[in-house]
């Protein structure tokens, strides 16, 4: 079968343009699927519920629900600060305090990645304009001081304990808003949200775990862990 352009060359120049245009219109159009096209998922729920779980070794989960009949779009996964992070590279068996600092520094990197969209984002100070991270650890010769931002939680909703060699901080805040009463018709709606915190930090051996102090003030939890004097046994080794 002859090519289309070979047939066009045998006719007059005035007739070539309509024939060529008709051949172009007759060519089939092939559409490649778009990799960035979002898929729609049907979600059916009667109320909205948001749950935020924050941990120091940082597991932040958020489950969102919409009203019945709505559709949500699922976005493609983006690269983030979590890529390439190995938990084995954060542990220093020779220095527990260095391990704690490395974990918190890693969390600072994660919260700097705005693509993650975590609910608990760093706060910006109005006075200095600097970013305030939601936790901090300071250490001197006498004690270890830790700060955790827990906005919206009261003292009754926060529990601090020591399990074996780990400091555990847990909190849960429930909130419910809505209008009308259940069964009153389509106009009834109610919104429930639950925020929970589960933080766990390994304490150094030289800390006095029986004298841990905790204070919650204006949404900021301050934890103080005193240190004990550790007598180091030194043995001189003769060099031959």
Curated annotation (Swiss-Prot):
Keywords: Chloroplast, Plastid, Stress response, Transit peptide. One of its GO terms (cellular component) is chloroplast. Coiled coil: none annotated. One of its GO terms (biological process) is response to heat. Induction: By heat shock. Its main location: plastid. Pfam families: HSP20. Residues 126-240 form the sHSP domain. It is found in: Plastid, Chloroplast. InterPro entries: A-crystallin/Hsp20_dom (IPR002068), HSP20-like_chaperone (IPR008978), HSP21-like (IPR044587). This is 26.7 kDa heat shock protein, chloroplastic. It comes from Oryza sativa subsp. japonica (Rice). The lineage of its organism: Eukaryota, Viridiplantae, Streptophyta, Embryophyta, Tracheophyta.
